[in-house]
């Protein structure tokens, strides 16, 4: 998932969205 979609992608999950190298990750201790 790209940076632009990251906040919506991670919404509703107990996660903090972060973006590295144009890749979205929802940090829950695991990489998404």
Curated annotation (Swiss-Prot):
Subcellular location(s) of the protein: Secreted
Signal sequence interval, chain numbering: none
One Pfam family here: Toxin_6
Main location: secreted
Organism of provenance: Hottentotta tamulus (Eastern Indian scorpion)
Free-text note on domains in this protein's UniProt record: Has the structural arrangement of an alpha-helix connected to a beta-sheet by disulfide bonds (CSalpha/beta).
Keywords for this protein: Disulfide bond, Ion channel impairing toxin, Neurotoxin, Potassium channel impairing toxin, Secreted, Toxin, Voltage-gated potassium channel impairing toxin
UniProt GO molecular function: ion channel inhibitor activity; potassium channel regulator activity; toxin activity
Stated name of the protein: Potassium channel toxin alpha-KTx 9.4
Disulfide bonds: 3-19, 6-24, 10-26
Keyword Thylakoid: no
Family membership: Belongs to the short scorpion toxin superfamily. Potassium channel inhibitor family. Alpha-KTx 09 subfamily.
């Amino acid at each position: 998932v790209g940076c632009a979609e990251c906040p919506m992608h991670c919404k509703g999950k107990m996660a903090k969205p972060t973006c590295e190298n144009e890749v979205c990750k929802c940090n829950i201790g695991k990489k998404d």
